[in-house]
Every structure is written in structure tokens, then in C-alpha cells.
Regions:
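Extracytoplasmic/periplasmic substrate-recognition and gating elements
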Residues: 143-212
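Acidic, glycine-anchored loop motifs typical of Ca2+
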Residues: 20, 43-54
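Short helices/loops that flank or line small-molecule/ion binding pockets
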Residues: 34-39, 117-132
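Glycine-centered hinge/linker elements that transmit conformational signals in sensory
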Residues: 34-39, 68-116
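Beta->alpha turn/N-cap motifs
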Residues: 62, 133-139
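Periplasmic solute-binding protein
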Residues: 1-21, 59-83, 170-179
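C-terminal capping/gating helix-and-loop segments adjacent to ligand/active sites or protein-protein/ligand interfaces
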Residues: 205-259
Length: 259
């Protein structure tokens, strides 16, 4: 599940609004995120060029691009039709408006940095990016570092949007493949379901409480935000099964949306 992490030191340095309060009041939106990110970017070495050595409002790995903004806005590339099959859902005016605004926003490379995983992670724990968008599991990588950070759900598009919606990155999933020539689908399905239920009953809660809340997160507010994150997320068939790689190529989405 993708989410935001924010740097508390930079938040305090630039006297920015409390993001936890914004989330609770339903005011944590794409525009608010961009406003805060813009205030926190800086050319640290004064060479009039923004490079990996400078400070940014938000950093993300280049293989992900702006997808979290899109899903957080409540949009998807595919929807399920009346026959239970996926079909494109790109035709709405809202989709076009969101796409254009996200494209124009993240094209500001003085504020938004896209790069290799290790670069954006280092940028965050060295306190050179206010926001960092990654999968939840990545928060564990910050344990060796002293950076004071908190968790946030993906931003809503507007305050009028009812819920905060999280994006499940299909590249981080481990699907179960069942052979087409399987002669006992019912038995196989029963076993797979049993394993899934056992994982939920015996693994999810201990991981949630012992690892995340007990060792990774650094304040009670992040635990509150985590509850929001894990209780409302979406999958997109186009991302999950690669039905429309021409439009939704994960590795090239950032390049597509900024060109």
C-alpha cells in the first residue's frame, strides 16, 4: 500500500500546517500537499541547479511516478462492466482534468524529485525532502536512521471527496498461480483460501501491532493514520494484470505524464 511519509524537522523549520490535523479535518488534499511541498524545496548549494544533492518538497522512485496522486483522487484506469470484465474508464472529464493538473504539477522539478530508490530514501533520511511517497513496507528501512517522520494517507483530490483512498502497488504483490489443467479446482481453491485466512488470522495482526506499531512508527498519530491507510485501498486490474501497458506502463508513467 502506497502512502506518504513526512519529515517533522522540515515541517517545523518551514512552519507548515500540522498534516495530522489536516487529515482529521478532511483538508489533506492534492493542492495542500503541493502548497506545502513548494515551500520546502531549496537549492542547498546555491549553484542555481536542482540536483540530487538539493532539497525537495517530495521525492519518489522513478518506477512509480505520479500514480499515487491519481488513485488518491479516486480515479482508476479500469472499471468492471456489467459482465464482470474490466474495461477502460478514461473517458470522463474528471479523469482528464486530474491527469492534466497532476502532469503540470509534477513537471516542476524544483519541487518534485524522481529518482532511484536509494537516492530518494537517502534524501528523506538526510532531511532533504519534506514528503516521501513509498509503500508501507519501506518505512522499515528508516529504522537505522534518526530522522523524525510520520505517516499520512494519500491526499484527497478536494475536501469534498468523501474518503482517503490508498493505492495498492501491483508490483509489490505475490499472486497465487493455479495451473489451467488443474483437475480439482474446488480442492485447490479451498487450500488457497485456508492459507489466506490463516495469514490474516495469525500474521497480519502481529505484524501490524508488533512490527509496525511496536518498532517502525515513531508516534501515536502515525498509528492513527495507519488505520486510515489499511482500511480503504484499491487495486486496478490494468495495473494488476497489465491489460493496458501502453497507457499504464508503471516504469514509464512518470516520463509520460511529464512530457
Amino acid at each position: 500500500v502506497r502512502l506518504f511519509m513526512f519529515n517533522k524537522s522540515l515541517l517545523s523549520k518551514y512552519q507548515l500546517e500540522d498534516p495530522y490535523k489536516l487529515v482529521r479535518e478532511g483538508k489533506w488534499t492534492f493542492d495542500k500537499m503541493n502548497e506545502m511541498a513548494t515551500k520546502a524545496s531549496a537549492d542547498l548549494n546555491g549553484d542555481a541547479q536542482m540536483t540530487v544533492d538539493d532539497q525537495y518538497g517530495l521525492g519518489w522512485q522513478s518506477s512509480v511516478g505520479a500514480q499515487p496522486f491519481f488513485f488518491g483522487a479516486g480515479e482508476k484506469v479500469s472499471k468492471i462492466d456489467k459482465d464482470g470484465l474490466p474495461e477502460f474508464s478514461l473517458e470522463s472529464e474528471r479523469f482528464t482534468d486530474i491527469y492534466n493538473k497532476v502532469r503540470d504539477t509534477v513537471a516542476n522539478h524544483d519541487v518534485y524529485y524522481s529518482g532511484a530508490d536509494e537516492d530518494v530514501l537517502k534524501m528523506f533520511y538526510e532531511e532533504r525532502s519534506l514528503f516521501f511517497t513509498e509503500v508501507l513496507n519501506c518505512a522499515k528501512k528508516l529504522r537505522p536512521y534518526e530522522v523524525d517522520f510520520g505517516l499520512l494517507p494519500l491526499a484527497k483530490w478536494t475536501e469534498e471527496q468523501e474518503d482517503y483512498i490508498q493505492y495498492v502497488d501491483a508490483w509489490c504483490l505475490s499472486p497465487v498461480v493455479i495451473a489451467k489443467n488443474n483437475t480439482n479446482m474446488d480442492r485447490t481453491g479451498f487450500i488457497v483460501q485456508a492459507i489466506a485466512e490463516a495469514s490474516k488470522d495469525y500474521l497480519v495482526q502481529p505484524y501490524y501491532e508488533t512490527v509496525l506499531n511496536g518498532k517502525v512508527l515513531r508516534d501515536e498519530e502515525s498509528s492513527e493514520m495507519l488505520d486510515i491507510v489499511v482500511n480503504n485501498f484499491v487495486l486496478d486490474n490494468c495495473d494488476l494484470y497489465d491489460y493496458c501497458s501502453v497507457l499504464w506502463d508503471c516504469s514509464n508513467f512518470y516520463k509520460r505524464i511529464t512530457n
